[in-house]
């Protein structure tokens, strides 16, 4: 029997939902009958419109979409202006103030504190600049990820941006495929570093070569069924398929999308993700059915991986290759791109607008987003680099961050998410400064990947980090407080591994001390040149557990309490805050 949400989607979903959102926006959120809100808000997600957490019932988040994080000239400015004009909440964040944009781990952007009545005006402003929120959420194909410097990378192995653009236009744009069993992630990368993280996507294409008709050709190998979350992460499995051209790559991915769309589990949502589908069917059965019913050419067996070293978030030494896109890098055409480190991926509206101005002044105006919540300024001529790097904004969002800021990712947390158990962004921003000021890192270590997810859904990709944090709750001194599980040793790469959880339900005020003890042990006991992931593997989980010592420190934050019980973690007067939220 199909789930309740499947019944709602079968009645109305996809493009048709847009008209209903506009109707409700004209009448106001109160026009949505109370007993029908779950149904409508489930449908709204396809258009990137999410009601915020309980207590923020009159406010919405909007997630935007693109192909591979590419923001064309003018688009970031339009997004920043929307945030400035429409994304102001009733209470300021103590760390970030009011009105901002959040950069995500899928090369996308989220806006918060939007009112339903303003959604049509927000769409009008964004769509005039070519920015869309269609298919940005819900049970559909989400933002397609890839190498953010596709087409500019001087070491690109296989061209991928035209294929990504076609997936965006022809596959994600197909309303007949809008209603998937659950959310579905596609990645394509033709680079040598592996920055699309193919192994944690529902379907991923990675660069390969194969001899075809006596000639060695480059193309992609296909992997399926990867994903994180619910403490049941999976590495995508090899489908044993090689595709040598854009047309066949498109057809194979489309075929798997259609196969999952038709045969995926729609009865039990907890088992509906493609990773469970691949578990149950197996790659051989999926490949056979793909060949028989979904593609009209003979599938070739997998080719040879042509990456020398998979280095992006792989726990490899920096000498092996790039592990992110931060810094100044030469493009294939002789210009440069400059990757900035935005702490926890949050840009104020004014910073976003200023960044767009800087992109215009020093480069082509194009900005690209990475899977590590960072922006790239593209197409900067060499003669303009020094002036660009001297811009005051690049002192704040720097291309030369300290190792803690450079490696850290944080999800939305209890500030807006109903699933999260802890506040994430503001706490992490302050923790980064505390770690910078109190913990020494070896000179040859440029980054430590610390990923913080406010719950086990793992939007912050904690499973893939050097140090992964899951939001929890725990008792301390007789009170319920925010807490975290601590894991170590995760990473993507030729040999993907997920973190081993070494400490559970550590009160939030003891976590910075625990991280400090881990990093200090790493610095003292590592072999020369050893990365954190390599050190964890060498030491073993049991030993590393002993090194991870939770303790109170002088770290302070104004939100150590159990914020899950508050409508907003930073609201001081609960009664006044409730009145503010419901006054609309």
Label for each model-derived stretch:
Residues 1-584:
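Peripheral terminal and linker regions in Fe-S/redox and tRNA-modifying enzymes
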């Amino acid at each position: 029997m199909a789930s309740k949400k499947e019944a709602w989607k079968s009645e109305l979903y996809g493009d048709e939902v847009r008209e209903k959102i506009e109707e409700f926006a004209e009448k106001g959120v109160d026009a949505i009958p109370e007993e029908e809100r779950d149904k409508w808000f489930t449908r709204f997600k396809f258009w990137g419109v999410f009601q915020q957490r309980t207590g923020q019932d009159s406010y919405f988040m909007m997630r935007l979409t693109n192909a591979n994080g590419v923001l064309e000239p003018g688009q970031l400015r339009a997004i920043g202006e929307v945030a400035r004009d429409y994304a102001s909440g009733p209470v300021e964040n103590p760390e970030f103030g009011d009105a901002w944009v959040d950069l995500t781990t899928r090369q996308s952007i989220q806006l918060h504190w939007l009112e339903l009545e303003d959604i049509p005006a927000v769409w009008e402003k964004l769509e005039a600049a070519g920015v869309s929120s269609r298919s940005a959420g819900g049970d559909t194909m989400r933002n397609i990820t890839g190498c953010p410097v596709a087409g500019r990378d001087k070491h690109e192995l296989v061209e991928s941006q035209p294929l990504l653009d076609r997936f965006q236009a022809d596959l994600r744009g197909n309303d007949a495929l809008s209603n998937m069993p659950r959310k579905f992630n596609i990645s394509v990368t033709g680079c040598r570093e592996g920055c699309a993280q193919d192994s944690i996507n529902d379907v991923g294409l990675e660069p390969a070569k194969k001899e075809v008709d006596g000639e060695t050709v480059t193309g992609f190998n296909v992997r399926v069924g990867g994903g994180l979350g619910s403490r049941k992460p999976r590495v995508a499995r090899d489908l044993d398929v090689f595709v040598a051209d854009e047309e066949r790559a498109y057809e194979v991915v489309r075929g798997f999308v259609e196969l999952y769309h038709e045969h995926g589990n729609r009865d039990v949502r907890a088992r509906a993700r493609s990773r469970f589908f691949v578990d149950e069917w197996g790659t051989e059965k999926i490949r056979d059915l793909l060949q028989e019913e979904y593609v009209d050419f003979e599938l070739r067996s997998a080719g040879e991986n042509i990456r020398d070293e998979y280095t992006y978030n792989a726990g490899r030494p920096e000498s092996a290759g790039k592990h992110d896109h931060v810094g100044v890098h030469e493009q294939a055409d002789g210009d440069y791109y400059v990757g900035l480190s935005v702490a926890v991926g949050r840009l104020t509206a004014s910073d976003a607008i200023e960044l767009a101005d800087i992109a215009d002044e020093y480069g082509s105006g194009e900005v690209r987003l990475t899977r590590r919540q960072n922006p790239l300024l593209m197409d900067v001529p060499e003669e303009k680099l020094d002036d660009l790097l001297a811009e005051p904004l690049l002192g704040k969002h720097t291309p030369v961050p300290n190792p803690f800021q450079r490696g850290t990712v944080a999800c939305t947390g209890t500030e807006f998410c109903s699933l999260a158990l802890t506040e994430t962004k503001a706490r992490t921003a302050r923790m980064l400064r505390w770690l910078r000021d109190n913990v020494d890192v070896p000179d040859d270590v440029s980054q430590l990947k610390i990923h913080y997810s406010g719950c086990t859904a793992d939007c912050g990709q904690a499973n893939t980090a050097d140090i992964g944090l899951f939001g929890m709750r725990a008792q301390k001194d007789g009170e319920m407080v925010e807490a975290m599980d601590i894991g170590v040793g995760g990473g993507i790469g030729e040999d993907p591994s997920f973190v081993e959880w070494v400490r559970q339900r550590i009160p939030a005020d003891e976590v910075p001390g625990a991280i400090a003890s881990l990093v200090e042990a790493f610095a003292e006991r590592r072999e020369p040149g050893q990365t954190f992931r390599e050190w964890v593997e060498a030491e073993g989980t049991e030993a590393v557990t002993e090194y991870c010592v939770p303790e109170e420190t002088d770290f302070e934050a104004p939100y150590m309490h159990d914020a899950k019980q508050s409508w907003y973690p930073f609201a001081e007067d609960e009664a006044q805050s409730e009145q503010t939220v419901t006054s609309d």
